[in-house]
Amino acid sequence: MPLLDSFKVDHTKMNAPAVRIAKTMCTPKGDNITVFDLRFCIPNKEILSPKGIHTLEHLFAGFMRDHLNGDSIEIIDISPMGCRTGFYMSLIGTPNEQEVSEAWLASMQDVLGVQDQASIPELNIYQCGSYTEHSLEDAHEIAKNVIARGIGVNKNEDLSLDNSLLK
């Protein structure tokens, strides 16, 4: 089985909240695809609650599109990490970490503006595979934490995992 890029970085050196360009690629037609690691929590020290990350998934995907999509950028997908320490965002385009950070921060402000559970998009049995597994309160706490701590940048060259540790 191939070793994925996300497992070639030293998680003990990651800062959070922080943006990292996880991968860049160019399609055969010449479109640039960028994958960002949006790290909300310090790996192995903090974790997002299941209900909080699920609610944030519903809110964050739309808010990030509101703040980042444009003529040269289109978000393909924003998905929570299985380890529950952040999200991966794949997009067409090449925004820099600062642009992504600003959109992320604005999105967290938007999350705080959601006043009740009924305002969470797609929160119903037809559009959500686990529609009872949500907490707006937890999502608000996550957003407050990101805003209070600020968003940094994780650089791949600073996180390179020594080959002796690769398994």
From Swiss-Prot:
Required cofactor names: Fe cation
A Pfam family the protein falls into: LuxS
GO molecular function, one term: iron ion binding
Residues given in the record as Fe cation binding sites: 54, 58, 128
Reaction(s) this enzyme catalyzes, per UniProt: S-(5-deoxy-D-ribos-5-yl)-L-homocysteine = (S)-4,5-dihydroxypentane-2,3-dione + L-homocysteine
Cofactor binding, per record: Binds 1 Fe cation per subunit.
Keywords: Autoinducer synthesis, Iron, Lyase, Metal-binding, Quorum sensing
Family as reported in the entry's similarity comment: Belongs to the LuxS family.
NCBIfam families (UniProt xref): PRK02260.1-2
Full protein name: S-ribosylhomocysteine lyase
Organism: Haemophilus influenzae (strain 86-028NP)
Recorded name of the encoding gene: luxS
